[in-house]
Amino acid sequence: MDSEKIFNALNQIKISIDQHKDEIEKLDQEIGDGDHIFNIQRGIKESLDLKDELSGKAPNEVLKKIGMKIMTTVGGSSGALFSTLIMGMSKKYNDELSDQKNIAVMFTEGVEAMKKRGKSDLGEKTMLDV
């Protein structure tokens, strides 16, 4: 795993979010104020803008910086929760593991950090269930 793979994955997330923009916006308008899509798009764009600065850096450092960028650019509770997920992932990177194993371990840690911060768990109709 390296910074290039992380930014490639983030770009794929951006593409998927852009493809489902209308659906995401509609869902947010039904339960919120409808601005989630704009906030998350801004956060991802600004995170992708870090690519040159973070090129060649260790994956845990890249994830931590992306998490901090999400925290400062995505409003509301979703910014805090997504940044917690990503920064939680950064704490478990181990360069001795395969990419697949690292992703599994890191994502599990990120989800646990998000559950703790949001004081929620699966099945409670939160972001974790989506």
Identify the meaning behind each predicted range.
Residues 1-130:
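N-terminal loops that bind phosphate or other acidic moieties
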